[in-house]
Amino acid sequence: MPERPPIRALRRDPDDPAVAQALASLARGSDLVFPSRFQKWLRDFRQVHAHRKEEPPPQSPPPGHTVPAFYFPCGRPPPRPQDTEDAIALVECAFEGLPRGRAGLGDMAVVAKACGCPLYWKAPLFYAAGGERTGSVSVHMFVAMWRKVLLTCHDDAARFVRLLGHPGCSGLIQEDFVPFLQDVVNSHPGLAFLRAAKDFHSRYITTVIQRIFYTVNRSWSGMISREELRRSSFLQAVSQLEVEPDINRMTSFFSYEHFYVIYCKFWELDLDRDLTIDRSDLARHGDGAISSRMIDRIFSGAVTRARLPRKVGKLSYADFVWFLLSEEDKTTPTSTEYWFRCMDLDGDGALSMFELEFFYEEQAQRMAARGVEPLPFHDLARQVLDLVAPRCPGRITLRDLKQCGLAGEFFDAFFNVDKYLAREQREQAGTPQDTDSDPAASAWDRYAAEEYDFLVAEEAMAEDDDDHDEGSDPIDLYGLADEDCDDLEPL
């Protein structure tokens, strides 16, 4: 019988694919294969594979380039960590000059300056360090808080949110501003006359808070984010409080004269003195210039965002602040959004011809009642479409109104008959509006200045009138001792 191949030799390299293949061939019936022939075939096969270059293992892709960080929600970190310790050293030096190394709220001006913060950050710094619980803060309490702020917040917006806001929150709600603004009332020289009238502290604070959210909270979310603070001028206004003794020059947010105008306008409408107004009260604003259909939309909840339960069919003082700011200055983005929400009946983000006709129908009736022949709706529609130039014919979006720059003219044509007719008369006469006013002042600033002068003159005349009726109800900002209501809380 033929001698079989040396199986033991083949097993010396069992991982060799050629050996495995040879063994498989033998298993399928290798009795017909002569040993010499098989060994020759195996030798030739190995020689061929020995000359082949072993394929290199697959290479991993080249490492990607490191993308530098570009998103800093809390501000860009400082280039040197040592900057934090230097800042802490300045704070510790400030506490060394205080009695017992502790700071009360009255001492926080020195600490705020040592922190490199504006003066009126003193109350937020004090309360963030736990001063409200103990009445004062030690250097250890304050340094522990301030080190965390410096390590996690790297610009003014992030630090302001961290100091005023609740732990873990990335934004500020309205209640967060109350301690800060109360300190402004208590310590700013321009508000010294207001400190004795404690009943009106909450009214002033509520007004300022609503103005802050009206201007800064562009998302209408009810929470001011760090990015919204960065894009606004609010922090610059807070810094300006330190160098501007006349609070009335701070027209963006803090002006007392502006508060006086807003509150007096509300007081004139709130006949029952419950600090709320209903539809009939609001209908008297501006001698009934605003249409009833628009008033219904204001009370529908389209532009009110109170988190607390409200009285049905009532507007709070905070709601009225938004209404008055929007009505008297229709050039601001928030005003455009306010009235657009009111006119967008179906909430689809566009004003259709049906919605425009719905509001103009009452406007035309009110013009006819004043002896003015109104334009047919189709003629007015062509005029406003030419005015706005919407991207989609027959549908006006919020973006269209903001881009055209004539949102005030558009809105007045549909729900404020007095302003619409006054504008038409000026255009026919060829006279510009407010020729004697400051061109840099906003429409709201001009309105507030005119109304404040009128209210002051009205009070002066009432005081000089010896025949003044004692039973009448003049507007008295400080003489409301008979008012039976709680302090107005910011909504």
Curated annotation (Swiss-Prot):
Residues 460-491 are annotated as: Disordered. Coiled coil: none annotated. Expressed in testis, kidney, liver, lung, spleen, brain and heart. Residues 460-473, 481-491 have a biased composition (Acidic residues). Keywords: Calcium, Metal-binding. InterPro entries: EF-hand-dom_pair, EF-hand_13, EF_Hand_1_Ca_BS, EF_hand_dom, P2R3A_B_D_EF-hand. Transmembrane segments: none annotated. Pfam families: EF-hand_13, EF-hand_5, P2R3B_EF-hand. Residues 331-366 form the EF-hand domain. Ca(2+) binds at D344, D346, D348, E355. GO terms for cellular component: protein phosphatase type 2A complex. GO terms for biological process: negative regulation of cell population proliferation; negative regulation of G1/S transition of mitotic cell cycle. One of its GO terms (molecular function) is calcium ion binding. PP2A consists of a common heterodimeric core enzyme, composed of a 36 kDa catalytic subunit (subunit C) and a 65 kDa constant regulatory subunit (PR65 or subunit A), that associates with a variety of regulatory subunits. Proteins that associate with the core dimer include three families of regulatory subunits B (the R2/B/PR55/B55, R3/B''/PR72/PR130/PR59 and R5/B'/B56 families), the 48 kDa variable regulatory subunit, viral proteins, and cell signaling molecules. The B regulatory subunit might modulate substrate selectivity and catalytic activity, and might also direct the localization of the catalytic enzyme to a particular subcellular compartment. Interacts with retinoblastoma-related protein p107 (in vivo). May target PP2A core dimer to p107 resulting in dephosphorylation of p107. PANTHER family: PHOSPHATASE 2A REGULATORY SUBUNIT-RELATED, SERINE_THREONINE-PROTEIN PHOSPHATASE 2A REGULATORY SUBUNIT B'' SUBUNIT BETA. This is Serine/threonine-protein phosphatase 2A regulatory subunit B'' subunit delta. It comes from Mus musculus.
